[in-house]
Amino acid sequence: MEIINLGKAEGLPPVDWAAVAGKLDSGSAPAPDGANSRTTWLSTVNEDGSPHVTAVGALWLDGTFWFQTGAGTRKGRNVARDPRCSIAASIRDTDVVIEGDATRVTEPGALARIAKAWADNGWPAQPDDSGPGITAPFNAPSQGPPPWNVYRVEPRSAIVTLGTEPGGLTRFRF
């Protein structure tokens, strides 16, 4: 991993990736209270090259972000055509942007595991019997009907801002 301290000129130390990963591991699901709730934001590339940013219920599991969407949604069409994307999240005192490629997940064991992770975090997802996707009694209205495709975003790089002492701004290349 390459570590680039973007806050060096201001005398800030580099952010510790292990600490960031630990926060993501313990807190990537939204909290039920307003003080600790958070949203993850997915940025994809439109056909004309412009960015498309939308909120998603992404989870951090096994060192990567996972999200789901309907095949006919703009984000679904965008990642099918061009997998480059980023996911941004604020986890307590840390802002994280992960950049990578969205890879559609179709392996039944992986779908079952991520569906269980979503269910364990309050969204009753389960693998869909009709094919390589997931289903649930509800989803965001813009997702369209189930089944929904699941994507994994393997980090290629990350930018992390630490908002509490000692502060920090660091880019990581994996």
Positions of the model-derived regions?
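Charged, gly/pro-rich active-site loop segments
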Residues: M1-A19, T94-F174
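Short beta-strand segments
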Residues: S37-A71, R77-V79, C85-A89, V96-D101
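Short, intrinsically disordered, mixed-charge
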Residues: A80-C85, K116, D120
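An N-terminal domain-cap segment
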Residues: G11-V56
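Short linear motifs in intrinsically disordered
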Residues: G27-G34, K75-N78, P141
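A generic structural signal for alpha-helix starts
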Residues: T73-R74, G109
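Short histidine-centered beta-strand/loop micro-motifs
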Residues: Q68-T69, R77-A80, P141-Q143, L162-G163
